[in-house]
Structures are given as structure tokens and as C-alpha cells.
């Protein structure tokens, strides 16, 4: 009866700081770990910061944590009890005003360097093309009305950003663990619908990859990596799959 009342109380208070306080006080012998994925990871980090002063043994782990979340000082000081896990090219852990501005500039510059018709390029997005066949080398693209418009726009944005002052730098919080791809295995046998698929964009012909966990810092995620896996690497099932694989490998090593 007591257990059911406690569960009901927790359910009604779920999501509130006060509710978490009451549950923690009712079960003082329990440890408290706050976890989340994506936006939930960001929420878990903020909630943990609010609770940590009263519960110093609290720990927090975020998977695919949003990139621009805490200032550098707070992010560093929380490293003893807060961990951010990032899978390979996960775009969400690299998102920020600075990285988006940089990506916009790179995309516009790349478009001005295109040799081929843009409609043709869009039709061949999932094909692997030679960059020399598609783009002029940087600085060697011919002058055009579009290129001049892009140059003017980027110069305007640079002046605007300079007049606004330096951006307040925000980084990934806590200790950062990166799950890094170490090798590409053989491609699974492709079905007919995916014969032109580029490097496993489709789930039905995804390559088998090996990952290793490496401790790093938030500075390693200061640019958005444009790749075929940048969105897929954020999916919770991908995190679960690779973490389970690493856990099994660790168990095998420790048993030897």
C-alpha cells in the first residue's frame, strides 16, 4: 500500500522540481541520476543544476545533448557529476548560433562554386560525385551576378555581427564522451531500391561500423559536420545500439 501511494505521488509530481524534492526526501537511501536525450538531455542538465546544491551526490547523463547549453565555466565545473554523450556526427550536439552562421556561409560559398546546374545536383544528392567535377576550386570560381550578391550578403552579415558585439559562448556541459567511428565494414547487400544510395543513407543498406568511446571537450563540436549520418546519429535507437555494443565489448575484454 505504501509503495503504491509513493508511486502515485511521484506520478502526480513528475516534471516538477518540488516533486523531485519530495520523492528524494521520502527515500533518502536512494541515489538520484537524471538522464535524457536531445531536448530531454538539455532539460535534465538544467534540472540537475537546480537540484545539485541540495543533493551533491546527484549525477546526470545526457545523450545527444544540445551543443550550446552552458557557459564554459559552469560546463567545466560540472564535469565531476555531469556527462554528455555524443554519437559521431550528431548535428544536435553541434547546434549553436555560431555554428549555424558558419554553416550558412559555407553552404552559400559552395553554391557559388558549383559548375553544374543546381537542378541536376539536387537530382543526384544520394550519388557519390567527384568534387572536382562538381565545383570550382575555392577562389577560382567565375564572377557572376549571384556570386556578387552572395559576397555582398556575407559582408553585410559580418558587419552586422561585429556591431552586435561578441556572442556569449555556450558549450556542451560537463564531461564529454564522444562515440567515434573507427572503421567502415562491408556494405550490407543492397536491395534494388537502394543501388544508387550513397554510403548508407537508407537504413536498409546501412554499413556496419565500429565505434570507440573517447573523452574529449566541447571544443571538438564547434562545427556542424555535414554527412549522410548527421541526422541518423541523433536517433535514440542509434545511441542505444552503439552503447550496448560497446558495453558487450567491454565485458568481453574484462573477462579475459
Description of each model-found segment:
Residues 35-40, 44:
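Gly/Ala-rich beta-loop-alpha elbow adjacent to hydrolase catalytic centers
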Residues 1-33, 46-256:
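Alpha/beta hydrolase fold serine-hydrolase catalytic domain that processes acyl esters and thioesters
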Amino acid at each position: 500500500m505504501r509503495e503504491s501511494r509513493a508511486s502515485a505521488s511521484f506520478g502526480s509530481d513528475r516534471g516538477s522540481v518540488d516533486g523531485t524534492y519530495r520523492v528524494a526526501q521520502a527515500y533518502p537511501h536512494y541515489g538520484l541520476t537524471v538522464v535524457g536525450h536531445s531536448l530531454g538531455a538539455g532539460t535534465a542538465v538544467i534540472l540537475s543544476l537546480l537540484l545539485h546544491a541540495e543533493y551533491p551526490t546527484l549525477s546526470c547523463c545526457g545523450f545527444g545533448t544540445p551543443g550550446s547549453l552552458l557557459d564554459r565555466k559552469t560546463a567545466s565545473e560540472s564535469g565531476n557529476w555531469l556527462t554528455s554523450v555524443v554519437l559521431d556526427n550528431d548535428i544536435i550536439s553541434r547546434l549553436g548560433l555560431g555554428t549555424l552562421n558558419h554553416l550558412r556561409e559555407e553552404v552559400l560559398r559552395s553554391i557559388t562554386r558549383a559548375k553544374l546546374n543546381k537542378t541536376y545536383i539536387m537530382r543526384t544528392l544520394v550519388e557519390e560525385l567527384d568534387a572536382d567535377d562538381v565545383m570550382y576550386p575555392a577562389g577560382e570560381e567565375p564572377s557572376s551576378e549571384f556570386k556578387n550578391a552572395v559576397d555582398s550578403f556575407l559582408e553585410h552579415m559580418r558587419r552586422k555581427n561585429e556591431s552586435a558585439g561578441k556572442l556569449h559562448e555556450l558549450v556542451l556541459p560537463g564531461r564529454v564522451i564522444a562515440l567515434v567511428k573507427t572503421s567502415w565494414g562491408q556494405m550490407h547487400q543492397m536491395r534494388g531500391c537502394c543501388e544508387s544510395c550513397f554510403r548508407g543513407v537508407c537504413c536498409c543498406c546501412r554499413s556496419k561500423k565500429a565505434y570507440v568511446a573517447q573523452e574529449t571537450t566541447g571544443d571538438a563540436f564547434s562545427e556542424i559536420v555535414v554527412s549522410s549520418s548527421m541526422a541518423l546519429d541523433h536517433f535514440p535507437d542509434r545511441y542505444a545500439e552503439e552503447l550496448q555494443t560497446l558495453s558487450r565489448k567491454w565485458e568481453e575484454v574484462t573477462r579475459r
